[in-house]
Amino acid sequence: MGPAMFMAFRLWNWLLLLAVLTRSEATSYVNESSNPTAQQAPDARFAASSSDPDEGISVFELDYDYVQIPYEVTLWILLASLAKIGFHLYHRLPHLMPESCLLIIVGALVGGIIFGTHHKSPPVMDSSIYFLYLLPPIVLESGYFMPTRPFFENIGSILWWAGLGALINAFGIGLSLYFICQIKAFGLGDINLLHNLLFGSLISAVDPVAVLAVFEEARVNEQLYMMIFGEALLNDGISVVLYNILIAFTKMHKFEDIEAVDILAGCARFVIVGCGGVFFGIIFGFISAFITRFTQNISAIEPLIVFMFSYLSYLAAETLYLSGILAITACAVTMKKYVEENVSQTSYTTIKYFMKMLSSVSETLIFIFMGVSTIGKNHEWNWAFICFTLLFCQIWRAISVFTLFYVSNQFRTFPFSIKDQFIIFYSGVRGAGSFSLAFLLPLSLFPRKKLFVTATLVVTYFTVFFQGITIGPLVRYLDVRKTNKKESINEELHSRLMDHLKAGIEDVCGQWSHYQVRDKFKKFDHRYLRKILIRRNLPKSSIVSLYKKLEMKQAIEMVETGILSSVASPTPYQSERIQGIKRLSPEDVESMRDILTRSMYQVRQRTLSYNKYNLKPQTSEKQAKEILIRRQNTLRESMRKGQSLPWGKPAGTKNFRYLSFPYSNPQAARREARAAEPTDDDGTDSGFQPLMFSIHSRAGSLQERRQTQAVIPMKRLQRGEKALSFSYRSNTSWEDQAGWRRMDVLRPKPLFYAVAEEYDSGEQTEEETSAILSRWTAEHRHSTEHHKSHSPLLHRK
């Protein structure tokens, strides 16, 4: 079924081609037989129909001139679209060669037919068509769908490689070819230095679109992918700026000599053109984001605002002789960040696919016209110039790659390996940019323009067909380091947490890196820009908003891939139940927020900055003390309410634990000591009679309990032992002891007969009493030491 459909689409291509040729012949016939005034005014056809009153109404007329330009453009776009459809019908073909190879082949076949039938190809490309209509959609799509975070994490290496690498390649190739042209045997003496430098600037413009497709399929590591992507994004802009400056030098050199001041002015213009283009793009991006803030009720015009303002940034920059490519790139990156949060989901889908469609159509037309231009008489062949051009392109790319990355690896945490550098060198595929710049050279300034076009076509064909086809097997053969699996929402959230943590650590250590810059920009963005440019500035956490955005993105991807196609929609009952939920009014929400603010405990905030020079040393100590006091107050309140514990254990459980106390609770031991009942014949030689506890009676008076507590230390003092801290309250002040005693008075005591049944005898011997007191002393010594070692206040200086 696949080959049959492929042949059917190929047949449609030939029929469309015959229709184009037939219309071209009809054009010549109509031009000879029609009224000459029809070519002078746009409404000549209507004037001609009413000029002769004796002429009757014709049933059938042919006026191809009236629809020639849109008709031919539509046929070319349709031919390119059918070629892409036929290319993807055969599933093995996209894995064998890039899509650009097929488009060039189709264009070469169409060009051969046009050349064989002695017809002139339609003017698909000239200076205004390329720079004003074909190039902006390609650059806009690349900038809008650029992965922002990896790009700005590697922005230093990308600018170092894309900027300086383009200059090294341009001047290296130009100077090398100039020395070759000085050899008289090659017959290239009429090509001066400026012409060679201009050719070097246009031939250094790379177009690794096919390489990026191979990288996405092979899932190479993120650093390697971003270096190629950044080169594809910025290299065209730098090459076009250098191309325009050298054309201006060529025009100047035709009438006067170039001085050192002119060279300095050219360097200054190079910087101003690039920075000015970026500034214009950011300004237009902010304006478009601000306008989309008010389009919630008219979402149909949101895609129009995005496309019009991006195109206006390009035109405004070109009006002031700035870089339109860098302007539309900066505008796309700015709109991606802010406009997406203002537009609806339907508008976002429309923007996404319409932008990809325009970019695909532009690239397809350029590649097809490249194939059409291959067959013709506008070529000049010189073996020396073409072969040395191909050789110097490879040599200078290798020099620039291995030299610049050797320097950048000295400052990178994760350096590029030799395999990565070789893949970057092999990815220098020339494409539509180089051919378009060569084709648009003015013939009056460059008499050897045909030679430049031929050399550009040879380099483009070699890199697209040879390097573009073999890059995939080479990546698999070298086993280039692959990227990890796609980050989940949890990993993305934790990466943001680590960014904040690293920024704080760097500030404390006095270091400075991109984490600090990113953190400061986020603060400025959240404080000023988002309040002005974003429609709904809700006071919610950035992590919550990021989670919502990632969830929405993941759901859209699942729907687009068909994963959710089999999932059933919610039942009508569920939808009615959801709709029937009462929504809270803003007043109710505000009152709930006030209640929670007053009632909930809020830990005092830490100092806002992490700077080591203004960090207060006593803040954390006060916080710890305050939290400990609050926990003790909570414990006292719970003990005043009775012995019923909140987690459902019986009142006499021994080993329960509060947060502010050590693990061995001294209160349980004190209850055991109070439960002990000494006998009358105790034999003790102390100066008082110890109190007797009745197991079935409740607690005695306050004076009796104080005397009972004083028995224990007096016994140990008489034995000659060293006085120690026997209870938890011995480490507290007099006021705290008074508080504990007041608490003991108010606290209800448990019924001892409900706790233990082994005390029903009502009597105990002296040995049993001594054993109980010894066990109570050991437990209190252990609990006191444990409390001292774990107290947060005792460890601070």
From Swiss-Prot:
Post-translational modification: May be phosphorylated.
InterPro entries listed in its UniProt record: Cation/H_exchanger_CPA1 (IPR018422), Cation/H_exchanger_TM (IPR006153), NaH_exchanger (IPR004709), NHE-2/4 (IPR001953), NHE_CaM-bd (IPR032103)
Topology within the bilayer: Multi-pass membrane protein
Location in the cell: Basolateral cell membrane; Apical cell membrane; Zymogen granule membrane
Gene knockout outcome: Mice are born at the expected Mendelian rate. They display lack of renal adaptation to metabolic acidosis marked by impaired medullary ammonia accumulation and inability to increase urinary net acid excretion to recover from acidosis. They show major morphological changes in the gastric mucosa associated with decreased numbers of gastric parietal cells and hypochlorhydria.
Pfam families recorded: Na_H_Exchanger (PF00999), NEXCaM_BD (PF16644)
Basic residues biased stretches: 783-797
Keywords tagged on the record: Antiport, Cell membrane, Cytoplasmic vesicle, Glycoprotein, Ion transport, Membrane, Phosphoprotein, Sodium, Sodium transport, Transmembrane, Transmembrane helix, Transport
One BP term from GO: transepithelial ammonium transport
Induction: Up-regulated upon metabolic acidosis.
Summary of the tissues where the protein is detected: Expressed in kidney. Expressed in uterus and endometrial epithelial cells. Expressed in the inner segments of inner medullary collecting ducts (IMCD) in kidney. Expressed in AGTR1-positive neurons in organum vasculosum of the lamina terminalis (at protein level).
UniProt subunit comment: Homodimer; each protomer has one site for sodium and one site for proton binding. Interacts with CHP1 and CHP2.
Function noted in UniProt: Electroneutral antiporter that exchanges sodium for protons or ammonium ions at the basolateral membrane of epithelia to regulate cell volume and intracellular pH upon hypertonic conditions. As part of transcellular ammonia transport in renal tubules, mediates basolateral ammonium extrusion in the medullary thick ascending limb, regulating the corticopapillary ammonium gradient and overall renal acid excretion. Mediates sodium:proton exchange in gastric parietal cells secondary to cAMP-dependent acid secretion and hyperosmolarity.
Family assignment from sequence similarity: Belongs to the monovalent cation:proton antiporter 1 (CPA1) transporter (TC 2.A.36) family.
NCBIfam families: b_cpa1 (TIGR00840)
Descriptive protein name: Sodium/hydrogen exchanger 4
Source organism of this protein record: Mus musculus
